[in-house]
From Swiss-Prot:
One of its GO terms (cellular component) is cytoplasm. Its main location: cytoplasm. Residues 173-258 form the PPIase FKBP-type domain. Disulfide bonds: none annotated. This is Trigger factor. It comes from Cupriavidus necator (strain ATCC 17699 / DSM 428 / KCTC 22496 / NCIMB 10442 / H16 / Stanier 337). Its EC number is 5.2.1.8. Consists of 3 domains; the N-terminus binds the ribosome, the middle domain has PPIase activity, while the C-terminus has intrinsic chaperone activity on its own. It is found in: Cytoplasm. HAMAP family: Trigger_factor_Tig (MF_00303). One of its GO terms (molecular function) is ribosome binding.
Length: 451
């Protein structure tokens, strides 16, 4: 039976589409006439190729296209008329049995969107983390900024930044420059030698044996020590062997951190050099980071709560579509990282199956909860979020123009606001426990979740 949508399962449907052959033939001839005006064929001027030759060359292909185009249009009309919400793309198969002589027919199989049932959210439990930015956190951030602007001066020098010392030994925090050479059984080996090699003592960037050898040395002094390479060392020629290294200290420099004054404040973009304003800006940035992290942590809990509270079947077609999107995202990421031939790299979609199913499921749940509770993002909400984001930039108005000048960026902010609305709605229903942590604890917890 044509035009009747059959139920094949929870989400699977089928409809038979019958199309009169006369309609197919009429549109086929119209397309061939249009094609004949542009088609090129040896021995004929453009637009002068006889219709019989055009039909012989292209008739079968054009008829195939017309049949499927008409089937697609009819499918769209039927599902729209019957208010059927199609998930993904239908699959068309030519139907041969039980078809009248004057018609062509297709079986279209497809999936529909599921009914989403969201359970009692009052049983959900979420933890809302809060953090207060103290003066100590501001001080720690200033120390980090100072260390990022560190410069070094040779020990034993006089002058404004000289330490006045003469015969000094290397200590933690100093930047040392040394030569080293390693030997195995008295012979040098590849990669075991360097000259004028700098590193900062105590940062842990060098092997512990090198750090210990350099500590306490004075310029011009040398020290020899053994270094055992592990069995699984990447250099096969030295793996499992013990080398004898000799280091010779050539320079010791001490770390000079900039003072916290107007010059330092200006280097951070404070035009008038106000240290007080600099501290206020740092506090504001830290509070913005706290808001971002705590919101992300709360959002993740809310999404998990919604997944647990909801019942729905997920259309396979939507999962497959999202798998392909994730494959393309992974490929673009590899390209941006400089991976050669990333465009042609085979990435199996199956590896994203679970992630895609979760994303699709959440998308369906969010769409339902937003629609049922009027949680759509309002224009004033979007504007307020953009204004808050723009505050951290030198020219907030330019940032506002940047957002409103691109529909994609605006859509991303709209999605963010919509998520906020859902989070606030769920928190209004669920059992929420407030938890206070330090900024350091918050950072550590956030990093663990990302790992």
């Amino acid at each position: 039976m044509s035009n009747v949508i059959e139920n094949l399962g929870k989400l699977d449907r089928k409809v038979t589409l019958a199309i009169p052959k006369a309609e197919v033939e009429k549109e086929k001839q119209e397309r061939l006439v249009r094609l004949s005006k542009t088609v090129k064929m040896s021995g004929f001027r453009p637009g002068k190729v006889p219709m019989k030759m055009v039909e012989k060359q292209y008739g079968q292909q054009v008829e195939f296209e017309v049949r499927f185009d008409k089937a697609a249009r009819k499918f769209f009309d039927i599902t729209k008329e019957q208010d059927v919400k199609v998930a993904g793309q239908p699959k068309f198969e030519i139907k041969n049995e039980g078809v009248g002589e004057d018609e062509v027919a297709f079986d279209a199989t497809f999936e529909v969107y599921p009914e989403v049932t969201i359970g009692d959210l009052s049983a959900a439990e979420v933890t809302r983390t809060g953090t207060e930015i103290t003066d100590a956190e501001v001080d720690k951030t200033i120390d980090i900024l100072r260390k990022q602007r560190v410069h070094y001066h040779a020990r034993g020098e006089a002058g404004e930044h000289g330490d006045g010392g003469a015969d000094v030994a290397a200590q933690n925090g100093d930047r040392v420059t040394l030569d080293f050479v390693g030997k195995i059984d008295g012979e040098e080996f590849a990669g075991g030698k360097a000259e004028d090699f700098p590193f900062v003592l105590g940062e842990g960037r060098m092997l512990p044996e090198f750090e210990q050898a350099a500590l306490g040395l004075k310029v011009g002094e040398s020290k020899t020590f053994p270094l055992a390479f592990p069995e699984d060392y990447h250099g096969k020629e030295v793996a499992g062997k013990t080398a004898e290294f000799t280091v010779t200290l050539k320079k010791i420099e001490w770390a000079h951190l900039p003072e916290v004054n107007d010059a330092f404040a200006k280097s951070l973009g404070i035009a008038d050099g106000s240290v007080e304003k600099m501290r206020a800006d740092i506090r504001e940035n830290l509070e913005r980071e706290v808001k971002r992290r705590t919101h992300s942590m709360l959002k993740d809990q809310v999404m998990e709560a919604l997944l647990k509270a909801s019942e729905l079947e997920v259309p396979k077609a939507l999962i497959e579509q999202d798998q392909e999107r994730l494959v393309e995202m992974a490929r673009r990421d590899l390209e941006q990282r400089g991976m050669p031939n990333a465009k042609d790299m085979p990435i199996p979609a199956e590896m994203f199956a679970q992630q895609a199913e979760r994303r699709v499921k959440l998308g369906l749940i969010l769409a339902e909860i937003v629609k049922a509770n009027g949680l759509e993002a309002k224009a004033d909400q979007i504007k307020a979020e953009i204004e808050d984001f723009a505050k951290s930039y030198e020219d907030p108005k330019e940032v506002m123009r940047w957002y409103y000048g691109d529909q994609q960026r605006l859509a991303e902010m709209e999605a963010y606001v919509l998520e906020n609305n859902v989070v606030n709605f769920v928190c209004g229903k669920a059992k929420v426990t407030d938890k206070k942590v330090s900024f350091e604890e918050l950072t550590a917890e956030g990093n663990q979740q990302q790992a």
